[in-house]
Amino acid sequence: MIKKYIAKWLPLIILVSIIVSCSKNNNQKYNPDKEITIKMVTHGQATDPFWSVGSNGAKDASRKLGITLRYQSPQNFDMVTMSQMIDAVIATKPDGLILSVPDIPALRKSIVSASKKNIPIIVINAGSEIMEEVDILTYVGQSEYEAGLKAAEEMLKQGVKSVLCINHEIGNISLDQREQGFRKTLSENSVSVKTVPIDASDPSETREMVRAFLSSNKKVDGILTLGPLGAIPIVRLLKDIDPQKNIKLATFDFTPEIIDGIMEGHIIFALDQQQYLQGYLPVVLMNLYITNKNTPAYKKLETGPSIINIENAQDVLALSKKGSR
């Protein structure tokens, strides 16, 4: 299993350690006597365990490099607050800026402002399309649409005929793209898909909403959640109402509780985009750009998706509990 992962992600390891191309023009010059400060702003909600792992990756990289990293995110999925955070960060004139961009229209003005001030930018996790408008060093994440296709392929193997899709962040372009890919493949195979939005901050409400939906839609035999904030309360619900495990539950991303659910048979698979890498790699790449003007040859560095299921869940359980997977 270890050899399999090394082979799959070797290109990313090489990109971190080797000079791969000349950089684009930038007016900033590196002063070796000046402490490097990188600012990172993501849309990760305070209650979302996915982003605690991503921030761990960024912080680990900054410690190993001996540079300063400042990480922040809104309490909730709030693009107004996030844009204000980005504007405030720009005013501090950081050496580099790392951003997730889940809503391009809402964040465009702030990102353009950073670019005009010659602050180097790396985008992670969401919003790779912004590279068509703004000079971005690279994007670190996965193709969400392709990940949706992959989720559908795995779900079809379970023989499902009617699927419920749970969206915990309405307006997040990444989740929309996941759903689009998922829905496309299932529709082509005559599988119906219905989407229900939830309030990620209220797990109890999520459970009751899904309970009511399943009660009135008894043909549903599959559920896909677009992230752990949807999956965790539904796992607990299905343990109560579906002990025979007739409803096949799958999710994007994972936490220790998701891994436990896979090992217990309550979750059939999780799609892994390696958020630790999405935090770690941008800090390394930004530091290389600031100090040595290195940039990746490829505009997108893909960290996923891969499948975590009963066959390999044990391999990542301890790492997930440690906060690095």
Give a label for each model feature.
Residues T37-G57, A61, L65, R70-I86, ...:
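Extracytoplasmic "Venus flytrap"
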Residues T138-L164, E205-R207, F254-I258, Q274-T291:
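Hydrophobic alpha-helical segments within soluble ligand-binding/sensing domains
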Residues L69-K93, V196-N217, A231-P233:
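Structural motif
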Residues I104-E146, D253-M263, I267-I268, L317:
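Flexible loop/hinge segments that line or gate small-molecule binding clefts
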